[in-house]
């Protein structure tokens, strides 16, 4: 074999190998890996988004890459609460607000409700009034806080201070509203809604993300003109010779997941910010606070001695000596006044404590679940009309709830899907759940009590947590006028823990340094508010658990 023949054989072998490798690594960006069909919609078949990269970060949020960590207190327990024993836990990647929700952010919500549901109209008065924070939380029988009561929420001097006086229920309603306003603007910006659609303040036709996905043609009360933006006008298909308008679907990747309260596990994981202690696939050491070190003061030269959070430093000492204030605040302080933690989150220790989503129990049971732990699931399903379509709440059927405190709040707004508990069809032959309300699952329900095997009547009487049963009800007088009566349970009680008690995390301006440890936990009734509890939102991460691009490996 001469040299030329050998070279020809080499070239043929290389080309054949190249063609074989190309054949084995087909590009399925525009064709189905299962059928080979076109998936761009050009051939008249189904279309799927093929250029989607990753979830965009919503307004105000920062990305938190999930992982495993030790949840609970890893130091001594001088209070002997024994409610945060350490467990190994994993949380999925998620997003969290960079700061606490501020007065200005919450006022934007109140103004929207005020314009959309004018409180001057008796029918809607409770909508706005039920969302307003309780400013009376600033009162103290032996303190002079009248100025804070009158100015803290609305004065521009406090615009970037964390909102307080908000119940857990109000925080959840704000989260739903924020979800809808963010997605509404995204669709408008991308041409799926008419420009300015978000300023539609017709009280009977509000945009709701979940309702849009289930019944898009009924959004805005069926006002089709608002649903046809520059881009959505092109979303049509021909069915039986009729041109049908197409709407944004989940598969298009346009809509963001809901804003919500973070779970306790997410909040603690994010507050710890363990990335600074990571070495390869392990953590070297522990963290007592969201920052490195065992002290609450900065050791850096430029601000040495300054406190790294806003908290009560001792009896009668909320900020230090005048002219040398170590934390710069008597009560709450402006957001971003202190350095962020490793994830870029501000005020995860101090300023205000924060509501999280979980129902409180005195333990986190790793044996029941060690991934994305959350106590408080209440499964619901969409309520359907007789024709099988989803039932939407309209301005005549706004849902209100009278809390134990006597306050009336709106829990179902026009444009939202009416919800109901899951029925037996969804529970039948299920191995992973068997009820709608799981707040007391494994700790507080009948199945976890020693009376479980006794008579049903006895089961109904027994409660693992002997918490008060207060109620509010209406009584008609001789003229038929309804008056509110409050039934206060004054019996002997052993605990305030119930299915309506929520976890509160983090320290506040009113707490000492003990509560700055992210592992500390306490509880507060979900329908009550105080001047030291605020909140921030979180959002699920869909798709990859890490950001695209280079991942550090050291």
Predicted regions located by residue number:
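Bacterial N-terminal signal peptides that target proteins for export
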Residues: 1-10
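C-terminal motif of bacterial Sec signal peptides marking the signal peptidase cleavage site
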Residues: 18-21
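Functional-site microenvironments in short loops/helix caps that host divalent-cation chemistry
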Residues: 26-42, 63-64, 70, 75, ...
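N-terminal low-complexity, Pro/Thr/Ser-rich intrinsically disordered segments
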Residues: 38-54
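Short, P/G- and charge-enriched loop/turn segments at secondary-structure junctions
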Residues: 49-51, 81-84, 491, 521-526
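A short glycine-rich, aromatic-capped structural motif
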Residues: 53-148, 159-182, 350, 534-535, ...
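Catalytic loop of the DD-peptidase/beta-lactamase superfamily, centered on the K-T-G motif
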Residues: 515, 520-523, 528, 533, ...
